[in-house]
């Protein structure tokens, strides 16, 4: 508690944490100072705000007697626009100081998913909320598990070999398909490729792996392998 108070001296009943991963940002000045200065431009906002350096980015700590979603969104959106190349994740709202470590991890995990979505889907959203990362809640804490990684590589090896030998795009198609939650129409719209082209590649993946993306149990295996691959290679 004492450490948390040193980092965040103003602590109200509710709080949320945002993680700004600026690994690929072209901004070279001191991030926390810039972020703090930008937040001062918000004319009226009841939230207490603290900024703390984190790796190549920073954490934004927001606290208030009652956090309103629109106020939280204003703060996060402002800094997302200030650091446009950042991957940004926002934790859930927490109430106990003892849960600060959990909130930090939620923000980090959400930022990592935001990074994946920006890279594979050209996701235009300013940030990713932890509440929306779905299965990644389970995968991220386990991603260093060797058996999980071996499962992914074992399933995807035939696809990787085919792409290497034929300069193919099977893996790229599979990863995009999974990121679109198995929605072929959405993948076509995002990638600019005809559905028949994508369907041909997915059928080729089925022939190589023995897993038919049209069958739910098979799709779930492909999706797990693809998501693990994305996290390991992001």
Predicted regions and their residues:
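Cytosolic nucleotide-utilizing catalytic cores of signal-transduction proteins
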Residues: 1-234
């Amino acid at each position: 508690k004492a450490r948390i108070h040193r980092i965040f001296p103003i602590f109200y009943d509710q709080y949320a944490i945002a993680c700004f991963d600026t690994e690929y940002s072209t901004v070279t000045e001191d991030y926390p100072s810039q972020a703090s200065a930008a937040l001062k431009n918000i004319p009226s906002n009841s939230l207490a705000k603290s900024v703390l350096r984190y790796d190549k980015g920073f954490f934004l700590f927001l606290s208030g007697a009652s956090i309103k979603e629109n106020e939280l969104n204003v703060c996060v959106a402002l800094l997302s626009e200030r650091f446009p190349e950042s991957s940004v994740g926002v934790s859930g709202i927490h109430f106990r100081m003892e849960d600060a470590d959990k909130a930090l991890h939620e923000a980090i995990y959400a930022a990592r998913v935001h990074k994946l979505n920006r890279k594979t889907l050209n996701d235009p959203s300013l940030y990713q909320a932890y509440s929306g990362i779905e299965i990644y809640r389970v995968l991220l804490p386990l991603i260093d598990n060797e058996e999980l990684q071996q499962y992914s590589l074992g399933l995807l090896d035939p696809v990787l070999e085919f792409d290497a030998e034929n300069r193919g795009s099977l893996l790229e198609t599979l990863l995009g398909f999974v990121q679109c939650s198995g929605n072929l129409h959405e993948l076509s719209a995002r990638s600019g490729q005809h559905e028949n082209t994508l369907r041909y590649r997915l059928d080729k993946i089925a022939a190589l792996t023995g897993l038919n993306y049209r069958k739910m149990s098979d799709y779930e295996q492909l999706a797990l392998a693809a998501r693990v691959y994305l996290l390991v290679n992001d």
